[in-house]
């Protein structure tokens, strides 16, 4: 809740007469995928700031937390559309590699030892079950406790995309979606 942030600001302000300096309170709307803090940083909101706190509502008090390193990805697979009932042999499903990718991610989790995760959704999976989809899309987020590990997970993920496309005779492309976040440690 944003009210937690404002209450913390009021509490710190109450002891300011004993301290030198000033206090500023920033809210970051649309933080999940919106790049709130990154945009504010790029526009100088934190210039001259000596100390910063991140406050996030939770059902418990957490003092020593880590904000994940994160990159959001959009992956598109391209096949050849066809009528599934009449000419299925003419089609190359763009959905098949996307489904394989999700299976591959599930298996890769076993190797990551809790150091990160890849989460995703099918954002475009075709329009009608009777048509073999020519294009399908997934949206993913790659997250880890460190940029180094996140880069490794991202590399594993892109290799899985390539493998899924090769296995199904499709093509693919990817792009970053939004802002990359570095890990933040207390």
Protein language model regions, located:
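Short N-terminal signal/transit or membrane-insertion segments
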Residues: 1-7, 53-74, 153-157, 161-170, ...
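Histidine/acidic-residue-rich, glycine-tolerant segments that coordinate divalent metal ions
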Residues: 3-6, 12, 17-133
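Metal-dependent amide/peptide-bond hydrolase catalytic core
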Residues: 95-186
């Amino acid at each position: 809740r944003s009210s937690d942030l404002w209450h913390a600001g009021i509490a710190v302000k109450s002891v300011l007469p004993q301290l030198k300096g000033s206090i500023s309170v920033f809210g970051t709307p649309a933080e999940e995928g919106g790049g709130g803090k990154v945009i504010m940083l790029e526009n100088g909101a934190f210039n001259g700031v000596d100390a910063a706190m991140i406050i996030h509502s939770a059902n418990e008090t957490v003092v020593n937390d880590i904000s994940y390193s994160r990159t959001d990805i959009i992956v598109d697979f391209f096949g050849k559309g066809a009528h599934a009932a009449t000419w299925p042999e003419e089609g190359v499903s763009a959905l098949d590699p996307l489904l394989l990718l999700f299976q591959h991610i599930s298996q890769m989790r076993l190797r990551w030892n809790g150091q990160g995760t890849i989460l995703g959704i099918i954002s475009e999976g075709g329009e009608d079950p009777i048509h073999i989809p020519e294009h399908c899309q997934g949206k993913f987020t790659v997250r880890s406790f460190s940029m180094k590990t996140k880069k490794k997970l991202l590399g594993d993920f892109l290799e899985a995309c390539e493998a899924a496309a090769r296995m199904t005779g499709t093509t693919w492309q990817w792009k970053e979606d939004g802002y990359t976040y570095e890990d933040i440690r207390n």
